[in-house]
Swiss-Prot record:
InterPro entries, per database record: YabA
Species, as recorded: Pediococcus pentosaceus (strain ATCC 25745 / CCUG 21536 / LMG 10740 / 183-1w)
Cellular localization per UniProt: Cytoplasm, Nucleoid
Name this polypeptide is given: Replication initiation control protein YabA
Single biological process term from Gene Ontology: DNA replication
Cofactor remark: Binds 1 zinc ion per subunit.
Length: 113
């Protein structure tokens, strides 16, 4: 092998090494971008989970069912009904005679929920 062939091989290896190094830098840059995006998405995901948790907690507070699975508003209607007044659309506010039962009122209080 003469000196020129040896020099050409070294030059080719050097060029290949530089190409490989450039590809490595490109890959590293792409990896950094992906890792940054991943970190941002994880933070955003965490914030969204916290907001969802707060929204769910607020919703549960607002519709918290108590006695017999009735909400506060239905409990108020139940108290009015127990006091002897109609809470149905037909006779709302009228006094119930002789504590009679009203199917309409009972449907409003205990019906489909």
């Amino acid at each position: 092998m003469d000196k020129k062939d040896l020099f050409d091989q070294i030059t080719e290896v050097t060029r290949n090494t530089e190409d490989l190094l450039n590809k490595l830098h490109e890959t590293q840059s792409a990896m950094v971008e992906i890792m940054e995006e991943n970190a941002e998405l994880q933070i955003e995901n965490q914030h969204l989970r916290e907001r969802l948790k707060q929204a769910t907690a607020a919703e549960n507070e607002g519709t918290k069912n108590t006695k017999y699975g009735l909400s506060k508003s239905l409990q108020n209607l139940e108290k009015l009904y127990a006091s002897g007044y109609h809470v149905c659309n037909e006779f709302y506010g009228k006094h119930r005679q002789d504590e009679e039962e009203c199917a309409f009122c009972l449907t409003v209080i205990y019906g489909d929920r």
